[in-house]
Amino acid sequence: MNEIASNNIPLKWDVFVAKRQGISRDLPPGKEQLMWVAGSSTLIYGVRDAVLVDTQLTIDHNRALAAWIAKSGKNLTTIYITHGHADHFFGIAELKSLFPNAKAVATPTAVKVMHRQGSPEYLAKFWTPRYPGQLPANPMFAEELKSKVIQLEGHELAPIELGHTDTDHTTCLHVPSIGLVVAGDAAYNDIHLYLAESNEQGRREWIAALDTIEALKPRTVIAGHKVPERDDDPRIIEETRQYIRDFDELARTSDTARELYDRMLELYPNRANPGSLWSSAHAAKG
């Protein structure tokens, strides 16, 4: 657990990380030991109450997440979803079955993305074939957040609009009293970025989003996808930014998706989930 005193009342946070199989599985041979992705869910809590940032994807991982929260003994008041990708909100129903009074909220634009991701058509086309029997049949969606901040025992938790990062209409959650940013997928921590939804303009917008996070001067930055053993140092802001710059440069000077993929692996040989890079390379080069 991590603790920093603020206004004589300690706020704390802890991070639940679960590994699963990545989305892209048709990539070239090699790097088999790295063909996994890990998603993070962050619990921010005070003396009695707690706020969760992002859920997990699969039923089993969300049951484990719910049990982990219950073990903390805290009263879960809010589930904040940073953006509309399914692996960040498909656990809402599972969590509410154990914490029925918790409200799941997100920004209005993020809620719209959720409804696309969780539609029967998108489930049948994209998610269910990749994770058969592992996902909720009828995902529950977040409600639109009506206020500018979330209150937690006298502390303000502020959603920050970031625009496009690994998808459209993303946010982070800033807790200024403890110097914490829960970055969602705006920052990655030793895992290949998902750039398949980001064209050249989108990548510029993602860098601008990282500048926005950096301007908050956080002491801790929790990435939506992180290697469990890695710490949450703010250096991951620049690491993510440099990865995008490198991808941009190599995308301009590579002729094929395979060439771009191989050249990025030369720069980043040890990052987890090369399948994400494979998808990104194909989106950039066809």
Region annotations inferred by a language model:
Residues 1-48:
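Zn-dependent metallo-beta-lactamase
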Residues 4, 112-238, 246, ...:
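Metallo-beta-lactamase
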Residues 53-56, 77-85, 105-108, 181-184, ...:
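Active-site neighborhood of phospho(di)ester-bond hydrolases with catalytic His/Asp-centered motifs
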